[in-house]
Amino acid sequence: MLTIALPTGRSLDNCVKILETAGLPVEKLKDAKRNLVIEEGVYKYLLAKPTDVPYIVEWGGASLGIVGNDVTEESNARLVHIADTGLGKCVMAIAAPEESLERYEIAGNAKNLAGLRVATKYVHLAERTFKELGIQIKILKLNGSIELAPVQGIADCIFDVVQTGATLKANGLAVVKETLDVSLHVVARESAVEINEPLFAKTVMAIKNSL
Ligand code: PRP
């Protein structure tokens, strides 16, 4: 049996599509209801919070995982990258209230932005990204509804994932800078890659060939 960790929420439909296209059984997975562990044929699927998928794979709870590279970049889990599925495309971006956009001419303006208050749930990725931009920031860690922070004036901007842009627009925010292309990636546990059991190898090959 091979265990694969999958993210709950808006990415799950794309994950089902990836597995189905690769020829893996997904009938029960499509009808998971509140079940967190679904066994189908020789596969066991685990349904986890997206941010937990990298750690579940790293700690050996699953041999494979599918998760956005926004999440793997934020985590410090040791994983082997298997493939970029190209599905679930979105971007990491800095966004700010529309009326404040003039402030953010990032190139050459880093000093003026020193002390910028950034709301995000991606603390590590934000630290790295703003460091690369040469901007010293203060981070307000939130766990969701990040857009609230600039709307309420408790942060100057947000650093978050943007898919359709609808949430930004609805809250009077606009993209200042896109910093990372994001999509769903297949990742594996290091030891699973080293051991490379037949079912693991066959599954990895099937997924790669179907992309
Ligand atoms: C994410 C993200 C944005 C939104 C972007 O939140 O944090 O709020 O999606 O998507 P859009 O560009 O299509 O509007 P999510 O829905 O995962 O919920 P959260 O606010 O609880 O993190």
What are these regions (language model features)?
Residues 1-211:
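Domain-level signature for soluble enzymes in the chorismate/prephenate branch of the shikimate pathway
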